[in-house]
Swiss-Prot record:
Region ranges (V4): 404-434
The name this protein goes by in its record: Envelope glycoprotein gp160
Annotated transmembrane regions: 697-717
Organism field: Simian immunodeficiency virus (isolate K6W) (SIV-mac)
GO biological process: membrane fusion involved in viral entry into host cell; symbiont entry into host cell; virion attachment to host cell
Segments of this protein annotated with the region Fusion peptide: 528-548
Role of this protein: The surface protein gp120 (SU) attaches the virus to the host lymphoid cell by binding to the primary receptor CD4. This interaction induces a structural rearrangement creating a high affinity binding site for a chemokine coreceptor like CCR5. This peculiar 2 stage receptor-interaction strategy allows gp120 to maintain the highly conserved coreceptor-binding site in a cryptic conformation, protected from neutralizing antibodies. These changes are transmitted to the transmembrane protein gp41 and are thought to activate its fusogenic potential by unmasking its fusion peptide. Surface protein gp120 (SU) may target the virus to gut-associated lymphoid tissue (GALT) by binding host ITGA4/ITGB7 (alpha-4/beta-7 integrins), a complex that mediates T-cell migration to the GALT. Interaction between gp120 and ITGA4/ITGB7 would allow the virus to enter GALT early in the infection, infecting and killing most of GALT's resting CD4+ T-cells. This T-cell depletion is believed to be the major insult to the host immune system leading to AIDS.
Swiss-Prot/TrEMBL domain comment: Some of the most genetically diverse regions of the viral genome are present in Env. They are called variable regions 1 through 5 (V1 through V5).
Disulfide bonds, paired cysteine numbers: 44-57, 101-222, 108-213, 113-170, 235-265, 245-257, 313-346, 397-461, 404-434
Miscellaneous: This is a macaque isolate.
A single GO molecular function term of this UniProt record: structural molecule activity
Lipid-bearing positions (S-palmitoyl cysteine): 789
One Gene Ontology cellular component: virion membrane
Length: 881
C-alpha cells in the first residue's frame, strides 16, 4: 500500500507539472505569408497617351516582376473577380469613350427614302439615279479565290464578289430650331439601320423608320469620339496581390495548381470587342490550348501563333462627315455622298487550314471531350438566327463596326461542298464581305443601342487572330460542331483567367507553450533589414511555419514598407492626373483603390490593438488554445495550409482574445486605483472622504439590520418556549409587568427557559438584558467558530500527517539515492582522473625512452656513415705502405 501511495503521489505531481507547463496558448504572429480570396476593385495602368488612356488609367512604368511560390492554389477562369471586373470595365470604357448622351427618339419618325425598282438601294443626285445591274444566279464554282498582299484587287477594291455598300438617301420633315416651323432634312443611312415598308408600285419612295425605335433607347455620341482599342493592365491595391497559375496544362479550371507565381499587376491586355474571333491577344503561344467551362460547352480556343493568322479589313472610300443641327441639343452626323461607296471587306492571311486542323486535334485530346475521334467529323459552323452580332462576325475597325458574312471563309477552311448552297454563298474564298451599321447592339447591356457617328477617310486595320470563341457540341460520337460564339466576355477570360485576386492576411494565430510575451537577453542585430518590395515577404509562402516565423520582423517591415511605397506611387500619379480623373468612372476607381489600401492597413492595426498586440511581430497571450488536438507541424506545414485548418476556429479565438484584452485593461485599471493609496496626500482627498462617509453609513445600516435580525431570532425563541410578548408596542416601551402568583398553587422548583422569578412577581428587563444577551450570542458564535475551525484543522492535520510523512520519507529516500549516485559519480570521476593521469605519465615516460633510444640509434648510424671515408682513407694508406 505504501508503494502504491507513493506511485499515486508521484503521478499526481507529474500530471500537475504537465498541466502547468504543457498548456498551449494562442500566439499572434504579424507578417505571415498567407492570403484569402478578395473581390475589391482593381485599377488599370496603360502606356497609351491618347485621350482615353489619359482619362481612364494611370501611367504604366512597366516594372512588374513575378515571384514564384512553392504553394498549391485553385484557379477558375469563370468564377473569377478579375475577369468579371475586366468585362464590366471594358464596357465602361466603351460607354465612356463614345459618351452617348443625346436620345435620338425625335428621329423615330417617318422618312421618305428612295427605293426604286431600278435601283433597289438608290442614291439621288440632281434627279439622277445611279443604278447597278440586278444580281443574277451565279453558276456553281469549284474555284478557290485567294488574295494576298500582292493581289491587285486589294488596292483597287474590286475583288470578285464584292459589291457596293447598301445605303439609302432619305428625307424627313420635323421642327428644328424654330419650334413653330417645320424644316426638311436630307440624311444618308446604311440600309441595315432602317426598317422600310413596301411602297406603291408607281412611287419610287418608301416609308422607312430608324431601326430599334420600338425596342430600345438609342443615344448618340455628344462629341465625335471613336472606339479605338487600347492596351492596359490591371494592378492590385496595396495590401492585395495577384496570383497566376503558371501551369501549361491549365484549361480554365484547376483546383490544385502547383506552379503559382505572384505579382502586383497582370500582363498587358487589349480592349477587344468582337465576336467569333479574338484579336491581338497576349496569350498566344507555340501551341493550341482550350479554356473549357466547367459546367457547359462554352470554350475559348487559343490559336497557335506559329501559323501567323491575320485578318486585314478595309472600308474603301474617302468619306466626309458633316454635323447637322436638327434641334437644340441634337447634332446628327450626316454623310453627304454622291456615289455609293465600295463595300467593306476583310481577308485572312496565314495557314488557316493547318491551324483549324490543329484545333480539331486539340479538341479530341481534351479530357472534357467525349465525342468522335475522327477529325473529319468535327466541323466549324456558323450560328443560326439571333442578333446580327451573332449571325455575322462583328468587329471594330478604327471606330467603324463591321458585320462580316463568313460563309466564304468557312467554305474555304472546311473545303465544303458548295453545290447545295445559295448562289451568293457558293464560293470558297479567304476574304469575306462586310457591311457597316451605325446603330449597334451593345454587347454587355441587353436592350440598349448606341448610335456611332461614321468615321472619316479611308479606313484600314490589321489584326492578329489569336483565339476562337466557340461552343463545342457532339451527339453520340457521330458529329461534332464547333459553333462560333458571340460571347465577347470569353475573350477576357482567356486573357485574365489564369489570375486570381487575393488579400494578404499578415495576421496568423497558432498555439505555443509560452503564456506571455517576454523579451530575451540576446542582443539585436545592428544590420538593417533589406526590403524586397511589397511582395518580397511572400517568397516564404512555401516555407515551413517555423522557418517563416524566424523572419517575421523582416517580413512585417517589408509588408509595411511595400504598402507605404505603393500608396506613395499611387498617390503621386493620382495627383498628377487629378484634373483628368475627376469626372471619369475609372478615376473614381483609382481613388477608391487608395482608400482601400489605407483601410486595409488600419484594419489590421486596429485588430492587433484590440488584442493588445499592437506593433508586435510575435505576441503571446493568456488565452488557452481551444483545440488541443489541432497543433501545427512547424517543420512541414506552411502558413497558408495552417490558416485553412484553423479557419473554423478563427471567430472563436478572436472573441476570446478580445475578452482577454478587456479583462487585462480592467485589471490594469484596478491596479492603478490601488497604486493611488501609497500617496499619503490622497487619503485626505475630498473624493476619499466622501467614500469614508459612505462606508460609515454602511456600518450604521449594518448594525441596525443586525439588531433587527437578533430581535426576530429572540422573538422566535420566545414563541418556541410558549411565551408570546405583547406586539402592540416595541420592547423599549415594555414595563415590568408584575403578576401575582396564586398562593394556593405549588411553587415550581425549576425554570424552563427564562420563566418567572421565584416569588410572586416576574418581569422582563429588556433594556438591561439586551446588551448582555448580545454579548453572550457573540461569545457563543465566536466559540462555535473557534471550535469548528480547530476541529477542522485537527482533522485536516490527521489526514495530511501520514501523507506528509510518506512524502517526507519518499523525498528522503530520493535524496539518499541521489547522494549515493553522486558519491558513485565522484568516486568514478576521481578514479577516471587518476587513470588518465597515470596513463599520461606512462605514455610520457614511454615516449621519452623511445625517443632517447631512437636518438642514440640515429646518432650511431650517423657517426658510422661519417666514418666511412676515414676508414677508406686509412685502408688506402695501409695498402700503400
Amino acid at each position: 500500500m505504501g508503494c502504491l501511495g507513493n506511485q499515486l503521489l508521484i503521478a499526481i505531481l507529474l500530471l500537475s507539472v504537465y498541466g502547468i507547463y504543457c498548456t498551449q496558448y494562442v500566439t499572434v504572429f504579424y507578417g505571415v505569408p498567407a492570403w484569402r480570396n478578395a473581390t475589391i476593385p482593381l485599377f488599370c495602368a496603360t502606356k497609351n497617351r491618347d485621350t482615353w488612356g489619359t482619362t481612364q488609367c494611370l501611367p504604366d512604368n512597366g516594372d512588374y516582376s513575378e515571384l514564384a511560390l512553392n504553394v498549391t492554389e485553385s484557379f477558375d477562369a469563370w468564377e473569377n473577380t478579375v475577369t468579371e471586373q475586366a468585362i464590366e470595365d471594358v464596357w465602361q470604357l466603351f460607354e465612356t469613350s463614345i459618351k452617348p448622351c443625346v436620345k435620338l427618339s425625335p428621329l423615330c419618325i417617318t422618312m421618305r427614302c428612295n427605293k426604286s425598282e431600278t435601283d433597289r438601294w438608290g442614291l439621288t443626285k440632281s434627279s439622277t439615279t445611279i443604278t447597278t445591274a440586278a444580281p443574277t444566279s451565279a453558276p456553281v464554282s469549284e474555284k478557290i479565290d485567294m488574295v494576298n498582299e500582292t493581289s491587285s484587287c486589294i488596292a483597287q477594291n474590286n475583288c470578285t464578289g464584292l459589291e457596293q455598300e447598301q445605303m439609302i438617301s432619305c428625307k424627313f420633315t420635323m421642327t428644328g430650331l424654330k419650334r413653330d416651323k417645320t424644316k426638311e432634312y436630307n440624311e444618308t443611312w446604311y440600309s441595315t439601320d432602317l426598317v422600310c415598308e413596301q411602297g406603291n408600285s408607281t412611287d419610287n419612295e418608301s416609308r422607312c423608320y430608324m431601326n430599334h425605335c420600338n425596342t430600345s433607347v438609342i443615344q448618340e455620341s455628344c462629341d465625335k469620339h471613336y472606339w479605338d482599342t487600347i492596351r492596359f493592365r490591371y494592378c492590385a491595391p496595396p495590401g492585395y496581390a495577384l496570383l497566376r497559375c503558371n501551369d501549361t496544362n491549365y484549361s480554365g479550371f484547376m483546383p490544385k495548381c502547383s506552379k503559382v507565381v505572384v505579382s502586383s499587376c497582370t500582363r498587358m491586355m487589349e480592349t477587344q470587342t468582337s465576336t467569333w474571333f479574338g484579336f491581338n491577344g497576349t496569350r498566344a503561344e507555340n501551341r493550341t490550348y482550350i479554356y473549357w467551362h466547367g459546367r457547359d460547352n462554352r470554350t475559348i480556343i487559343s490559336l497557335n501563333k506559329y501559323y501567323n493568322l491575320t485578318m486585314k479589313c478595309r472600308r474603301p472610300g474617302n468619306k466626309t462627315v458633316l454635323p447637322v443641327t436638327i434641334m437644340s441639343g441634337l447634332v446628327f452626323h450626316s454623310q453627304p455622298l454622291t456615289d455609293r461607296p465600295k463595300q467593306a471587306w476583310c481577308w485572312f492571311g496565314g495557314k488557316w487550314k493547318d491551324a483549324i486542323k490543329e484545333v480539331k486535334q486539340t479538341i479530341v485530346k481534351h479530357p472534357r471531350y467525349t465525342g468522335t475521334n475522327n477529325t473529319d467529323k468535327i466541323n466549324l459552323t456558323a450560328p443560326g438566327g439571333g442578333d446580327p452580332e451573332v449571325t455575322f462576325m462583328w468587329t471594330n475597325c478604327r471606330g467603324e463596326f463591321l458585320y462580316c458574312k463568313m460563309n466564304w471563309f468557312l467554305n474555304w477552311v472546311e473545303d465544303r461542298d458548295v453545290t447545295t448552297q445559295r448562289p451568293k454563298e457558293r464560293h470558297r474564298r479567304n476574304y469575306v464581305p462586310c457591311h457597316i451599321r451605325q446603330i449597334i447592339n451593345t454587347w454587355h447591356k441587353v436592350g440598349k443601342n448606341v448610335y456611332l457617328p461614321p468615321r472619316e477617310g479611308d479606313l484600314t486595320c490589321n489584326s492578329t487572330v489569336t483565339s476562337l470563341i466557340a461552343n463545342i457540341d457532339w451527339t453520340d460520337g457521330n458529329q461534332t460542331s464547333i459553333t462560333m460564339s458571340a460571347e465577347v466576355a470569353e475573350l477576357y477570360r482567356l486573357e485574365l483567367g489564369d489570375y486570381k485576386l487575393v488579400e494578404i492576411t499578415p495576421i496568423g494565430l497558432a498555439p505555443t507553450d509560452v503564456k506571455r510575451y517576454t523579451t530575451g537577453g540576446t542582443s539585436r542585430n545592428k544590420r538593417g533589414v533589406f526590403v524586397l518590395g511589397f511582395l518580397g515577404f511572400l517568397a516564404t509562402a512555401g516555407s515551413a511555419m517555423g522557418a517563416a516565423s524566424f523572419r517575421l520582423t523582416a517580413q512585417s517591415r517589408t509588408l509595411l514598407a511595400g504598402i507605404v511605397q505603393q500608396q506613395q506611387q499611387l498617390l503621386g500619379v493620382v495627383k498628377r492626373q487629378q484634373e483628368l480623373l475627376r469626372l471619369t468612372v475609372w478615376g473614381t476607381k483609382n481613388l477608391q483603390t487608395r482608400v482601400t489600401a489605407i483601410e486595409k492597413y488600419l484594419e489590421d492595426q486596429a485588430q492587433l490593438n484590440a488584442w493588445g498586440c499592437a506593433f508586435r511581430q510575435v505576441c503571446h497571450t493568456t488565452v488557452p488554445w481551444p483545440n488541443a488536438s489541432l497543433t501545427p507541424d512547424w517543420n512541414n506545414d506552411t502558413w497558408q495550409e495552417w490558416e485553412r485548418k484553423v479557419d473554423f476556429l478563427e471567430e472563436n479565438i478572436t472573441a476570446l482574445l478580445e475578452e482577454a484584452q478587456i479583462q487585462q485593461e480592467k485589471n490594469m485599471y484596478e491596479l492603478q486605483k490601488l497604486n493611488s493609496w501609497d500617496v499619503f496626500g490622497n487619503w485626505f482627498d475630498l473624493a476619499s472622504w466622501i467614500k469614508y462617509i459612505q462606508y460609515g453609513i454602511y456600518v450604521v445600516v449594518g448594525v441596525i439590520l443586525l439588531r433587527i435580525v437578533i430581535y426576530i431570532v429572540q422573538m422566535l425563541a420566545k414563541l418556541r418556549q410558549g411565551y408570546r410578548p405583547v406586539f402592540s408596542s416595541p420592547p423599549s416601551y415594555f414595563q415590568x409587568t408584575h403578576t401575582q402568583q396564586d398562593p394556593a398553587l405549588p411553587t415550581r422548583e425549576g425554570k424552563e427557559g427564562d420563566g418567572g422569578e421565584g416569588g410572586g412577581n416576574s418581569s422582563w428587563p429588556w433594556q438591561i438584558e439586551y446588551i448582555h444577551f448580545l454579548i453572550r450570542q457573540l461569545i457563543r458564535l465566536l466559540t462555535w467558530l473557534f471550535s469548528n475551525c480547530r476541529t477542522l484543522l485537527s482533522r485536516a492535520y490527521q489526514i495530511l500527517q501520514p501523507i506528509l510523512q510518506r512524502l517526507s520519507a519518499t523525498l528522503r529516500r530520493i535524496r539518499e539515492v541521489l547522494r549515493t549516485e553522486l558519491t558513485y559519480l565522484q568516486y568514478g570521476w576521481s578514479y577516471f582522473h587518476e587513470a588518465v593521469q597515470a596513463g599520461w605519465r606512462s605514455a610520457t615516460e614511454t615516449l621519452a625512452g623511445a625517443w632517447g633510444d631512437l636518438w642514440e640509434t640515429l646518432r650511431r648510424g650517423g657517426r658510422w656513415i661519417l666514418a666511412i671515408p676515414r676508414r677508406i682513407r686509412q685502408g688506402l694508406e695501409l695498402t700503400l705502405l
